[in-house]
Amino acid sequence: MEIHEHIIELPKKVYVGNGILSKLRDYLFQLNVLEPVLVVTGPNVRKIVIDEVAKGLNEIGKIEFIEVLDSSIDEVNRVEEKAKQLNPKFVLGIGGGKTIDVAKYVAYKLNVNFISIPTAPSHDGITSPFASIKGLGKPVSVKAKMPYAIIADINVLSSAPRRLINSGIGDTIGKLVAVRDWKLASKLTGEYYGDYTASLALLSAKHALSCTRIIHRDLKYSVSLLTEALISSGVAMGMAGSTRPASGSEHLFAHAVDLLQPNAALHGELVGMGSIIMAYIHGINWREIRNALDRIGAPTTAKQLGIPNDVIIKALTIAHTIRPERYTILGDRGLTWASAEKVARDTGVIE
């Protein structure tokens, strides 16, 4: 078998633990972080977190903060303009997935180091070298900067709204489908498939399933497990050089729903729901996925999210067009309306 060259991107350091944000100053010195530093935050980042970060940065030198409202290209352009004035050596992203997406995309465009400090374990974008930016003409991830370092404080992450934590679990469970799609594409189209990378993504999904069994009795341990799973998923993408190990037909469905009814649900909620349907089509244990999501109170039906049945069916019929170059169980032609309605009803996603 001919092996083609590809570059593996990995973080230099990953820090995970309870209360570790108080050690930020030490970590930044270990990482040789130099001024000036641009810190990108979001509107929902708690003041206590911002204050802790500011304290950790106060000996670095010139620091500037900027708050972003969403992960749109307009916000990217605004942050990039600020960055060009500052000419930072490092960009820090502090917040949820949207904030970190903007920070790492700007860091990528300017080719400067990026440090991820997530405050919500809502999806694997907090650790991956890809970003979901709205307004680029396609609802899929684009190349961004692999984090130079990740600083994940479990105390901070476990205090995030439960819905965001559940979203992260849904996003990670989706790897069960994504890897199946990747393997299928390799078999039918000859696409590169990495066994080790796929195994890493599957391990992340298995950890997420474990989270659903223990989260009610031990939130912090469960969030720690989820965080490590999200980090592993991001590393898998860095090793593969694409989102393939972490994004398949379940993500295409999620993007399709978001196109038809923007902001109807969190990304991980739609991925979780899509995973139920796509697992059914693959012929794997879709009930295990549905039961796992039910256990934590994550949505498993369109009704729970206020999404009309027709939107779900339409999304299933157009999902294969979102990334036509990415072969999945949906094939080249996708699902007919009748087939889409049947799988959605059979899995209980619509009534």
Swiss-Prot record:
GO terms for cellular component: cytoplasm. Keywords: Cytoplasm, Lipid biosynthesis, Lipid metabolism, Metal-binding, NAD, NADP, Oxidoreductase, Phospholipid biosynthesis, Phospholipid metabolism, Zinc. Zn(2+) binds at D171, H251, H267. Its EC number is 1.1.1.261. One of its GO terms (biological process) is glycerophospholipid metabolic process. Binds 1 zinc ion per subunit. Its main location: cytoplasm. Substrate binds at D124, D171, H255. It is found in: Cytoplasm. Its cofactor is Zn(2+). NAD(+) binds at G97, K98, T99, I100, D101, T119, A120, P121, S122, S128. InterPro entries: G1P_dehydrogenase_arc, G1PDH, Glycerol_DH. It is an enzyme of class 1 (oxidoreductase). GO terms for molecular function: glycerol-1-phosphate dehydrogenase (NAD+) activity; glycerol-1-phosphate dehydrogenase (NADP+) activity; metal ion binding. Homodimer. Catalyzes the NAD(P)H-dependent reduction of dihydroxyacetonephosphate (DHAP or glycerone phosphate) to glycerol 1-phosphate (G1P). The G1P thus generated is used as the glycerophosphate backbone of phospholipids in the cellular membranes of Archaea. This is Glycerol-1-phosphate dehydrogenase [NAD(P)+].
